[in-house]
Amino acid sequence: MSCKKWCSSSQAKWILAGSVTVTLVLAISLILGLTLHQGTQPGCENDAICGPDADMLDYLMGMGQISHRDGLLVTWYHAANSKKEMAAALNSDVMVLEADVTVEGFNTANETKVPIMAHPPAIYSDNTLQEWLEAVLASSQKGIKLDFKSLKAVGPSLDLLRQLTEAGRIRRPVWINADILRGPNVPISIEINATQFLTLVQEKYPKATISPGFTTLYVPQLPNSTYTQAMVETMQELVGALPQKVTFPVRAVMTRAAWPHFSWLLSQSERYSLTLWQGASDPVSVEDLLFIRDNSAAHQIYYDLFEPVLSQFKQLALNTTRKRTYYTGGSLIPLLQQPKGDGLEVEWLVLEVNGSGRRAAITVPDREGMILLDIGLQEPEAGNPVPILHTPGGPALTLESCLLRLAVHPRRWGIHVNIVEPEALRPSLATLAHLSTLGHLPWPVWVGSTVSHGSFVVPGHIAGRELLTAVAEVFPHVTVAPGWPEEMLDSGYQEQMVTDMLELCQGLRQPVSFQLQAGPLSQSPANTVARLLASSPRATVTVYHSTAGNSHVDLWAGLWAARAVDRTRVYYRISQEYWKDLQADVSSNRPSSRIGPSSVEGFPGESR
């Protein structure tokens, strides 16, 4: 009996011990499995998109996190500094982690060289950069953006990043950020030394995206205070020659007011993008964000914004049917031409005008493109001269009335104001400035004319300097479109004529589209178009045709000569018949041997 009890008791103990053992094994296996799972996240295998210097959008697309290259699709986690915040960030579905780096005990007797994760005024943290990187690399595939708050932290941090990269552990984009220039409303110098910061990056960790910013302070009492032209130009001088991708962090609440400067900056290199960020109390306007998006390519702008602004903006931005507003001084991309698309996508259009004065009616084109307006001057019996559409012997319609009528139409156009009477230049610019102020000029605008300058001085044409001076003084937010007098083109565009035009336009802030006649271009030095395009990243060439004195063979030769140099930055101001024929030849991938289109109609801006 006692043996039976002992055996029963012993059996129960073994069963209990076995159960506990099995439970422990299962628990350990589960923990180990989770740990191994975290440490063996599906990695990035394509070297082209997996390095620390990879494009963020290409990486996120490759990892299946976004569907296409659009900065609006990228999500961010702010200040993932402490271990608690870091854990929350890692457990979230955000795509990029943003964290701040300084050195332990910064500017105190206890200062060390250890990089820690903290945002000023904090100078201590429960998380070092090494611990932060170990956790992020082991348990996620999120992109990394490190914001450096002291120069002392940069060198040791870059050394650590280099070691991890050389060990093959950093297989994702890394952005290196620091505020290196004084920006709006900041009275004292608190920025990180630009030269030292950029030098450290080049020496220690050049394979990264650089994110150089401005110190800023938003002051509600100064809502119009923003980035200046000088600030933006200084930034370009600092980073223009660097080999890395560069994304400029700019304060969203101040960006639209400075858009002429940032539009210029983005055009300086395909390596550039902007990252719009929002201060916690900044009253960012959704309308301003939409304007910025409408005037840039989707891959050029990232949006690091708070709710509810982000959701409100995203809902409207992704609505393909909403009406867009374009910057008058902006590119035809993406309005009429896809990024890196063919300039032949853009068609030049004309208006039909019936009647005159207030009774005049216009028939707008049934398709999108650049609307060419030849502008002369009407001298009223009293008052100021009025710019009008120039239709010799035809009806009169004022430039203002024409543009107001176009503004109500939903189609997307650009406007090419071609000044055919020199006296109409400043009144036309004044009209454009007035309508722009009222919000009635929602498209890119070109202002151009035949100019007289240097080796191509011809009486009766606008002086080249006067064109540029008038634009700068009256309405600078346009693309300038100068051309050469036809009287000087019997031998084509000679080298000195091109040199003088380039000298005239040197240093212009505005985009320039040089107007070249196709016939004379065929008789010009082979490098004519290339020289003009090389003058500026914003320079384009527009080839147009004249029915006077040029054979159709020369005309087609000129069109193809320009096209052979560049497809993206060459436009074609030609009649619809020529435009269709050129498209057909391009589609068949062969230069044309045409002697002319099947029917040739007059086209405004042509010589006859």
Curated annotation (Swiss-Prot):
Top-level taxon in the UniProt lineage: Eukaryota
Biased composition (Polar residues): 586-596
Cited Pfam families: Menorin (PF10223)
Region (Disordered): 586-608
Entry membrane topology: Single-pass membrane protein
One of the record's GO cellular component terms: membrane
Localisation: Membrane
Keyword tags: Membrane, Transmembrane, Transmembrane helix
Annotated TM spans: 14-34
Repressor in keyword set: no
Chief localization: membrane
Family: Belongs to the menorin family.
Record-given protein name: Protein FAM151A
